[in-house]
Amino acid sequence: MSQVSAVDDIVSEYQGIEAQMSDPETMGDQTLFRKLSKRYSELQPIINVNNKLVQARDDHEAAEEMAYEDKEFAAEAERLAEEIVSLEEQLADLLAPRDPHDGDDIVMEVKAGAGGEEAALFAGELVRMYQRYAEKHGFTVEVLGLSESDLGGVKDMTLSIRSKTPSRDGAWSVFKFEGGVHRVQRVPVTESQGRIQTSAAGVLVYPEPDEVAEVEIDDKDLRVDVYRSSGKGGQGVNTTDSAVRITHLPTGLVVTCQKERSQIQNKARAMQVLAARLQAMAEEQAEAEAAEGRAAQIRTMDRSERIRTYNWPENRISDHRIGYKANNLDSVLNGDLDDLFSALQAAERAERLEAE
């Protein structure tokens, strides 16, 4: 399909969605309206760039005609010609193949791996890094479940990270790169001899379905247990039996939620996490032979299966998938992940274009 034909199809779809969203019946159906809003936000950048391109071409044609009579317009025509080239490149980039989940919210699990208490402390630092990045970029973060270590580290934490409004580039578009084993090299706070040690934490990331109903889950396949929430020091912990643990019997997947005040709310959020994990599992199985990112996520907490290393003594971060290295570990841990994510996105885009 030519670029012109592709843009025409998108303009037609965009206008159709616009008409649907202004229909009172659609506005009364929040599920449908949310889906349309999401698709609308995905198409809007393409429409905006295409509109600028159409205008620039019209202006360029007019400037060239006027340049015959007034040489001052020659410079304007030249500037517009350069703008057209830039806009054409932007449009081609927007039309390039992309991950269909890029606009999605996510569920993230961070687990301490090899390294005991030090691994749990490192897992906690990863969580704070993601929270700071999310705050800087307008995402909302919700803690769904937490198990802490004796020193306040994270043994296991489940997070929901969401866009505040529908977006073409949602949480999945950046956080999907975090799935895998993260290795840390430093002197642990528990080390009395001052020796550098290696520990690890694992991260799992799943795109979150818009609705639990989108994923088939049979009630007969579920075991639901209710228990009293627990946390280090008892701070901010519910004193009623409101925490919920759901086991999906066919797969053995277990999800918990203890953040909300009621069993009903905790069960609803746990079901959302389960739906995300089942959806990811189904897609992973379907793509088992394709080298997709989700298929390459962590399987064990083995320190050798690493995607990234955080070297404290040298203040260096290394992403082993793309050969990225930078000596700004301190700022990265403060949530400054833009350069790293841009490099990972560029590598993914190049890989997708090559596969076409």
Curated annotation (Swiss-Prot):
- Main location as per UniProt: cytoplasm
> What post-translational modification information does the record give?
Methylated by PrmC. Methylation increases the termination efficiency of RF1.
Q: Answer yes or no on keyword DNA damage.
A: no
Report the SS bond pairs: none
Q: Does the keyword S-adenosyl-L-methionine apply?
A: no
Gene3D superfamilies membership: 3.30.160.20, 3.30.70.1660, 6.10.140.1950
Coiled coil, from the record: none
Q: Give the Gene Ontology MF terms in alphabetical order.
A: translation release factor activity, codon specific
Q: What are the N5-methylglutamine sites (modified residues) in this protein?
A: 235
What SUPFAM superfamilies does its record include?
Release factor
Localization of this protein: Cytoplasm
Q: Which GO terms describe its cellular component?
A: cytoplasm
Keyword terms, alphabetized: Cytoplasm, Methylation, Protein biosynthesis
State the similarity comment: Belongs to the prokaryotic/mitochondrial release factor family.
Outline what the protein does: Peptide chain release factor 1 directs the termination of translation in response to the peptide chain termination codons UAG and UAA.
Task: Extract the HAMAP family matched here.
Answer: Rel_fac_1
Q: What's this protein's name?
A: Peptide chain release factor 1
Q: Which gene encodes it?
A: prfA
